[in-house]
């Protein structure tokens, strides 16, 4: 609990733990409302060449820059690849990825880590298309 220097100030409890079930339920409802509002208004991503893509790469950070060059080289060979670059990982661009699952042949989750994003991509497509992972 923080009060600062002012003793008359309302308490600011810094925890989500509440032992009273009624208050805990109200807190959870408030948290879920906040999460929903954030998910609706704060998701950010960039789509590059996704309109007519046969394949989609989902990549963020440094890997997305590498993948941009990859889709340029693939285009020279006649391969249509799009890039979806999440700018926010939370909230994740689930709906945008799900839309592309209806028209691409496959999705690659390209990451410079052990695969923290690939499961989110798989959840987004809900089995509609195969999702592979590359951890270069």
Please state what every model-predicted region is.
Residues 1-47:
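Conformationally flexible catalytic loops at phosphate/diphosphate-handling active centers
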Residues 44-79, 84, 90-96:
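Redox- and metal-dependent alpha/beta enzyme cores, enriched for Fe-S-associated oxidoreductases
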Residues 62-64, 88-89, 113-115, 136:
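Short, glycine-/Ser/Thr-/acidic-enriched flexible segments
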Residues 98-103:
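Short, conserved loop/helix-junction motifs that constitute active-site signature segments
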Residues 104-105, 129:
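A short helix->loop->beta-strand "cap" motif at the edges of active sites that frequently abuts
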Residues 105-111:
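Acidic beta-strand-to-loop metal/phosphate-binding motif
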Residues 111-136:
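Peripheral docking tails and interdomain loops at the edges
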């Amino acid at each position: 609990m923080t009060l600062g220097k002012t003793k008359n100030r309302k308490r600011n409890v810094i925890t989500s733990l509440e032992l009273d079930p009624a208050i805990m339920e109200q807190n959870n409802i408030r948290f879920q409302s906040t999460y929903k509002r954030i998910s609706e208004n704060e998701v950010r991503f960039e789509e590059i060449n996704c309109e007519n893509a046969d394949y989609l790469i989902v990549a963020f950070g440094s890997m997305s820059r590498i993948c941009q060059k990859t889709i340029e080289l693939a285009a020279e060979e006649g391969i249509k690849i799009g890039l979806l670059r999440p700018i926010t990982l939370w909230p994740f661009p689930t709906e945008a990825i799900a839309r592309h699952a209806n028209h691409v042949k496959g999705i690659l989750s390209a990451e410079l880590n052990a695969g923290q994003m690939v499961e989110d991509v798989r959840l987004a497509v809900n089995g509609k298309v195969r999702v592979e992972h590359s951890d270069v």
